[in-house]
Amino acid sequence: MSQSGEENLQGSWVELHFSNGNGSSVPASVSIYNGDMEKILLDAQHESGRSSSKSSHCDSPPRSQTPQDTNRAEIDSHSFGEKNSTLSEEDYIERRREVESILKKNSDWIWDWSSRPENIPPKEFLFKHPKRTATLSMRNTSVMKKGGIFSADFLKVFLPSLLLSHLLAIGLGIYIGRRLTTSTSTF
């Protein structure tokens, strides 16, 4: 794009024109509101910007005048004088009521959203893992530290528990084996 083309844009708005077959072009941004809703929203944004700009964390540069804004201002100034020629008085009032009802319905969630507290995490937001003081290992027990597997303290606990677990396993095996042999012989 040439330098003069970029200077003509003066912002991020681009106006597109479509031809309707007979050679005349129609702007793509034709709305039934003719920018009234946008003007109301911009006014509300400017009013809220005055009160909240001091506490705003993100200061942005002021918005520059775009070609679409200047065209819209010219159209709006002509539309007030030509209001009776394009629309009847009743249609104009009905359209204004529709716009106001839409703005009332949509403004509640905007107000709730904009007045909520900021989600700012604390400055010292570090995860601290708990230190393991005692691991579940036989090597770290006091019995193993004293004399190992063949110490008297370890053998006093380990051998009776080993013997008891084997006796329970043998007894359970014999009991289940007898139940199975008696149940198969009755069939």
UniProtKB/Swiss-Prot annotation:
Residues 42-86 are annotated as: Disordered. Residues 71-81 have a biased composition (Basic and acidic residues). A motif (BH3) lies at residues 93-118. Keywords: Apoptosis, Membrane, Mitochondrion, Mitochondrion outer membrane, Phosphoprotein, Transmembrane, Transmembrane helix. One of its GO terms (molecular function) is protein homodimerization activity. The modification Phosphoserine is found at S48, S60, S77, S79, S85, S88. GO terms for biological process: apoptotic process; autophagic cell death; brown fat cell differentiation; cardiac muscle cell apoptotic process; cellular response to cobalt ion; cellular response to hydrogen peroxide; cellular response to hypoxia; cellular response to mechanical stimulus. The chain crosses the membrane at residues 157-177. It holds the Pfam family BNIP3. InterPro entries: BNIP3 (IPR010548). It is found in: Mitochondrion; Mitochondrion outer membrane. Homodimer. Binds to BCL2. Interacts with BNIP3L and ACAA2. Interacts (via BH3 domain) with SPATA18 (via coiled-coil domains). Interacts with BOK; promotes BOK oligomerization. Interacts with PPTC7; this interaction promotes BNIP3 degradation. Belongs to the NIP3 family. This is BCL2/adenovirus E1B 19 kDa protein-interacting protein 3. It comes from Mus musculus (Mouse). The gene is Bnip3.
